[in-house]
């Protein structure tokens, strides 16, 4: 199993599947189409049936039931795309067997080192096989680790028919990282009662609370003139963006928050004197606080429009997803089964809110309750990202055990 995990994962991460916030196609990048087509062929090779890829790049497949019991149809999902925060082109995965727990030089030439001082969890992976980047790209374990685990689990179940299970549906979705993952997901065609996203982090992660999330695009329009004669004429759009950001509470940013605390996050800022564009994400677990944060954004914009003119600041703000807890609680047994599956494998479940989003956040509101399960990755979205193959193996075992328990309890 370990060899298959390594082979699939290292091959998958070399395919550039970063999504693109500025694209209006579905999926937003051609790499996701390329990857989806590859997975269609590999799902067929593994032995799954009803393998499809629609015009929007959504891949679905079925592992038929091998029991006569009336078992609820369950699904396992992962996403095709990788994050936009750091380059995902020309990923060169580095395999470190029997990791010694000490610092790893990712790139000697650029002096990029993964250290326990910066990442204190690193020594806990001593003895594991871990896969890192070469320091110049992200790894893409988010979510190609989860995708790999689903592929390996389905392959294992097909080759071990003594493990009884109901019908299992698999789906791989595009554009999760930019909040569009389930936008064109056909819940009815998927046909599952419940599902799990394999899109978590370290060992034991079991998540069914997520942020409420919104995105805000702000365009600041200035007036450019020669700086030598600019008095009372120039309006600097970049300074307008700085002024806007200055109105937000400094301590309510990702770098100062944890647990159930929400935040405003300036994701990007580009521009010049004439025009600047800023993109923020707004996050909070509590719906009232979430709405209050959006109101804060709107009020700052209104104040600046009153001061500088209506066209000085233009706001586009959209909700992206909501806290899935509301939709998971009525079917709490799906969390309990995952919890029991982990305990039976001597994995201590770590239940905590997702300080992020998964496809499950939106799918739960579309009628498909979908908690999230660990994959073994750490430090997502950057050059220090890595994954433990040993933990990936545990994740595969959890998928198998969940399928077995649904059949057993039917």
UniProtKB/Swiss-Prot annotation:
UniProt-listed Enzyme Commission number(s): 3.4.11.4
GO cellular component: cytosol
Cofactor list: Zn(2+)
Top enzyme class: hydrolase
Binding annotation for Zn(2+) 2: 142, 177, 381
GO MF annotations, alphabetized: metallopeptidase activity; tripeptide aminopeptidase activity; zinc ion binding
Cofactor binding comment, as recorded: Binds 2 Zn(2+) ions per subunit.
Catalytic activity: Release of the N-terminal residue from a tripeptide
The UniProt record lists the keyword Methyltransferase: no
Coiled coil ranges: none
Subcellular localization(s) per the UniProt record: Cytoplasm
Chain sites annotated for binding Zn(2+) 1: 79, 142, 199
GO BP, one annotated term: proteolysis
Active site per UniProt: 81, 176
Keywords: Aminopeptidase, Cytoplasm, Hydrolase, Metal-binding, Metalloprotease, Protease, Zinc
Origin superkingdom: Bacteria
Chief location bin: cytoplasm
Function: Cleaves the N-terminal amino acid of tripeptides.
Family: Belongs to the peptidase M20B family.
Listed name of the protein: Peptidase T
Source organism (scientific name): Bacillus cereus (strain AH820)
